[in-house]
């Protein structure tokens, strides 16, 4: 069996890994094996971070809505329950933006729903 020289393909693969890892520190950007491992770790961390980001933003929106609606005497859970009951399709992101930019509008929404 003849020997296969993997010159171009191997160089292309390593160059792609080096390009990805060029911003890493120390040997993680220079050595192929450690750069490959760090690339895998970076991709795993970014995947995990995207899921965590969704959770964190949802928590932030809920906190903002709750802070504004409690000033009006309505807890967050009751507001969301009444929104669902009246079939108003306002998600938490939009409600949080309304709570920050225009509190009176959110007060009007909550007063209309609760009645």
UniProtKB/Swiss-Prot annotation:
SUPFAM superfamilies xrefs: Ribosomal protein L20
Location in or out of the cell: Plastid, Chloroplast
Pfam families per UniProt: Ribosomal_L20
UniProt keyword annotations, A-Z: Chloroplast, Plastid, Ribonucleoprotein, Ribosomal protein, RNA-binding, rRNA-binding
Family matches, as InterPro entries: Ribosomal_bL20 (IPR005813), RIBOSOMAL_L20_CS (IPR049946), Ribosomal_protein_bL20_C (IPR035566)
Biological process, per Gene Ontology: ribosomal large subunit assembly; translation
Function field: Binds directly to 23S ribosomal RNA and is necessary for the in vitro assembly process of the 50S ribosomal subunit. It is not involved in the protein synthesizing functions of that subunit.
Family, similarity comment: Belongs to the bacterial ribosomal protein bL20 family.
UniProt protein name: Large ribosomal subunit protein bL20c
Organism: Nymphaea alba
Upper taxonomic lineage: Eukaryota, Viridiplantae, Streptophyta, Embryophyta, Tracheophyta
Gene: rpl20
